[in-house]
Amino acid sequence: MTSLLTFCAAALMEITGCFAFWAWLRLDKSPLWLIPGMLALALFAYLLTLADSPLAGRAYAAYGGIYIASALLWGWAIEGNRPDQWDVIGAAICLVGMSVILFGPRALPA
C-alpha cells in the first residue's frame, strides 16, 4: 500500500513538473514556471526511490499505470477535458497491469 501512495504522489509531481514546461512552451507562460516545475520533477524522481520494490525497472513499470490514470485525471481537473470511455477503459487496463506487477505473488529470493 505504501508504494501505491508513493506512486500517486510521484505522479502528481511528474505531471506538475511536465505541465510547467508545457505551460512555458505551449501556453506562452513565463519561464519562471520552470523553477517549480524542475523542483517537482526532482521530487518525483526522489519519490520513486521510496517505492517498496528491490528493482527499479519493476517499480517504474508498476508506476506507469498510476501515471496514466493520474494524467487523465489531471486533464479533467486542470484542463477541463473529461476522459471519454476509451480513456477510462485504457486506464483501467493499465491499472490492472499495475496491480499484477505490484501485488502479484513473488518467489522469495534464494
UniProtKB/Swiss-Prot annotation:
One of its GO terms (cellular component) is plasma membrane. Keywords: Cell inner membrane, Cell membrane, Membrane, Transmembrane, Transmembrane helix. The chain crosses the membrane at residues 4-24, 31-51, 59-79, 88-108. Signal peptide: none annotated. It is found in: Cell inner membrane. It is a multi-pass membrane protein. HAMAP family: UPF0060. Belongs to the UPF0060 family. This is UPF0060 membrane protein Rpal_4363.
